[in-house]
Amino acid sequence: MRKTSKMINQIYQLTKPKFINVKYQEEAIDQENHILIRPNYMAVCHADQRYYQGKRDPKILNKKLPMAMIHESCGTVISDPTGTYEVGQKVVMIPNQSPMQSDEEFYENYMTGTHFLSSGFDGFMREFVSLPKDRVVAYDAIEDTVAAITEFVSVGMHAMNRLLTLAHSKRERIAVIGDGSLAFVVANIINYTLPEAEIVVIGRHWEKLELFSFAKECYITDNIPEDLAFDHAFECCGGDGTGPAINDLIRYIRPQGTILMMGVSEYKVNLNTRDALEKGLILVGSSRSGRIDFENAIQMMEVKKFANRLKNILYLEEPVREIKDIHRVFATDLNTAFKTVFKWEV
């Protein structure tokens, strides 16, 4: 019988809101079909911040914690018994752990039995990460700080895939409601995937809307023209603005359009179902992503024009070397309009 090699891993777990402890855990480092990766750069997600601040239902926190946060990360391969990757090769890690990959009909991120790293399971705030080889995607011609948000971009890619699969073929005008980092990524994905489409962005802050220089039109939410119309739309608001945002889209979208709902709300929202039914709309819930979405995200980020645009929503923090640095990063992220990225040097 082959002897299993093991190594002590340092796992930086959130034990309760704003409290982080290091867990030392012995782990196998030569599991069959698994690749060992050392995280390099990471990005903070709103979901991480909600856990850190304790802004989830106490029952949810009790169920999910303790766990290591962060599900957006790139790293380098330190061991690969499968021979798929070279030691030192740069890769991004897929947090969605599904029983099988997507097929022609069903997506891996919605499958029963799927779990997600940094949601009740340890995320990437560890000394090293062991993942099945199909949960790793290589990259080369992308800067590490941009590669760190691949998971975030892949979520937008998944939503675009849903649109292309479900929406009717008239795609001349597409709206994005929201002016944060998700809206910016989705607008770029529209521009990349459907370059002839006119992009309409609806937001609350002119200073943020100015970043959408490639959009055809930009509007403030309380000053939308009565005659505004578009074929399909993406809702990228989340939070308390989720309901009003979706209802604005229902109001202005053309009949038989498709609305992709991407924003997360902690509370149930009221929707204008009367107009949604009258217009024959398709409302689609879109969450997380799978391997194909990561591959598509990397292809887009390899295009310099889009990689350079994505840099506009990144704030590079100082490296993290110890627990106090993690607290610093999350404090900084609270006051950052877009994505906080940092180097992981524990």
Swiss-Prot record:
Gene Ontology molecular function: ribitol-5-phosphate 2-dehydrogenase [(NAD(P)+] activity; zinc ion binding
Pfam families xrefs: ADH_N (PF08240)
EC number: 1.1.1.405
GO biological process, one term: poly(ribitol phosphate) teichoic acid biosynthetic process
Keywords annotated in UniProt: Cell wall biogenesis/degradation, Metal-binding, NADP, Oxidoreductase, Teichoic acid biosynthesis, Zinc
Annotated residues for binding of Zn(2+): C45, H71, E72, E151
EC class of the enzyme, as a word: oxidoreductase
Swiss-Prot/TrEMBL cofactor(s): Zn(2+)
UniProt-listed Gene3D superfamilies: Medium-chain alcohol dehydrogenases, catalytic domain (3.90.180.10), NAD(P)-binding Rossmann-like Domain (3.40.50.720)
Residue ranges crossing the lipid bilayer per the database entry: none
Substrates-to-products reaction catalysed: D-ribitol 5-phosphate + NADP(+) = D-ribulose 5-phosphate + NADPH + H(+)
UniProt xrefs under CDD domains: ribitol-5-phosphate_DH
InterPro entries according to UniProt: ADH-like_N (IPR013154), GroES-like_sf (IPR011032), NAD(P)-bd_dom_sf (IPR036291), TarJ (IPR034710)
Signal peptide: none
Keyword presence, Ribonucleoprotein: no
Pathway it works in: Cell wall biogenesis; poly(ribitol phosphate) teichoic acid biosynthesis
Stated family: Belongs to the zinc-containing alcohol dehydrogenase family.
Function: Catalyzes the NADPH dependent reduction of D-ribulose 5-phosphate to D-ribitol 5-phosphate.
Protein name as catalogued: Ribulose-5-phosphate reductase
Naturally occurring in which organism (per UniProt): Streptococcus pneumoniae (strain ATCC BAA-255 / R6)
This protein's encoding gene: tarJ
